[in-house]
Amino acid sequence: MSIIQEFKEFAIKGNMMDLAIGVIIGGAFGKIVDSLVKDIIMPLITVITGGGVDFSQKFIVLGANPNNLQSLDALQKAGINVLTYGNFLTILINFLILAWVVFLMVKLLNKLRRDKNEPEAPAATPEDIQLLREIRDELKKQA
């Protein structure tokens, strides 16, 4: 089978549309998580830690700082090499939250699929039917 034929089958089956929709929703969801971390979680962490922690301003100056600049913006504008580990921590928190939410969504979808695919348990045999079967079996043994 040629690669073009495989691509046509892939596109016709709807997998391409599913993928496109997933990418679009994923991009929008990523923005929601970014906002959650930046606008809600990080300010709460700052308040909990007594206002002294602002991850966006956490950095280490790598190399010489001849003008003794103190702010991250000033250091970056001056072209001084800066290790911005606070930004990394914020992105790491974003990732962990996003991974957790995706995990919960997959877990929920798997549970819903499992519930759909499980065959229904057969209904319990009523007592009178069970009694009639036992009587029939006894009569067969005696005959």
Swiss-Prot record:
Database matches in InterPro entries: Mechanosensitive_channel_CS, MS_channel, MSC/AndL, MscL_channel
Q: Identify the main location.
A: membrane
One Pfam family, short name please? MscL
Q: Where in the cell is it found?
A: Cell inner membrane
Q: Which Gene3D superfamilies match?
A: Large-conductance mechanosensitive channel, MscL, domain 1
Q: What keywords appear on the UniProt entry?
A: Cell inner membrane, Cell membrane, Ion channel, Ion transport, Membrane, Transmembrane, Transmembrane helix, Transport
Highest taxon listed in the record's lineage:
Bacteria
Q: Does the keyword Cell inner membrane apply?
A: yes
Q: Which HAMAP family match?
A: MscL
Please explain the role this protein plays, according to its UniProt record.
Channel that opens in response to stretch forces in the membrane lipid bilayer. May participate in the regulation of osmotic pressure changes within the cell.
Give the record's family classification.
Belongs to the MscL family.
Write down what this protein is called. Answer: Large-conductance mechanosensitive channel
Q: Which organism is it from?
A: Acinetobacter baumannii (strain ATCC 17978 / DSM 105126 / CIP 53.77 / LMG 1025 / NCDC KC755 / 5377)
Point out the gene that encodes the protein: mscL
